[in-house]
Amino acid sequence: MPLASIYADLSGFTDYIDRAIELGMIADAVKALHVIREEFQNVVHDDFGGRKVRFIGDCIHALHAEGDHRETNSEETIMEAAKCAGAIRSSFELCKSALVGVNELGLAVGVEYGQTPISKIGIQGDRSVRVASSKTTSVSEAMQKSCAHNETRFGPEVLKLAPVALNDLISSDGMAGDLQFDDVSTAVSAPAVAEVAAPYARAHAPSAVADTRAHLEKK
């Protein structure tokens, strides 16, 4: 079935690690990586009902689809994938405001839509691993790699199928700049997330929601 493939990768991470080694801040760097990766996964899974395929170092590969067991709603899938991509960036900005020494990091995001088989390998249960491989996943990764320090880029199939409101945010080559959740939500005239279940707080949720994220709690 067709679905949306999302790659989100930290840019400048190698330089960040080199600097952390020089300054003796390895523990802070390891903490930052784990917090940011957990935040990415929580946005994908808890906020948007998507699935993480895997982490590749400081990069997450995720999948999203809207519809039923018979067919995928392409327009809804693309809209929600765009919101998810924006929410990942918004939550990344929240992480940057709470963690030490990560202000120079950027985030490159690539999104594409198309047929993608999904399976699992390994021992059934916690020891199994989700796998997904297709032209769509390859293109979404290529879109991510073509981004500069803080950009989001959509693939050609997204450009063909995206609603007009979303296309207004995207250039002819798929670039969408520093795209965040509020940008997409406003463009498609969708209400912002009204409620977020505790203990998670989201940068893309209404400001009235208290920041109760345990791993971002200020001391």
Sequence positions of predicted segments:
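Serine endopeptidase catalytic core focused on the charge-relay Asp
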Residues: 88
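Intrinsically disordered, glycine/charged-rich C-terminal tails and inter-domain linkers
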Residues: 125-131, 139, 148-219
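Alpha-helical oligomerization segments
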Residues: 142-143
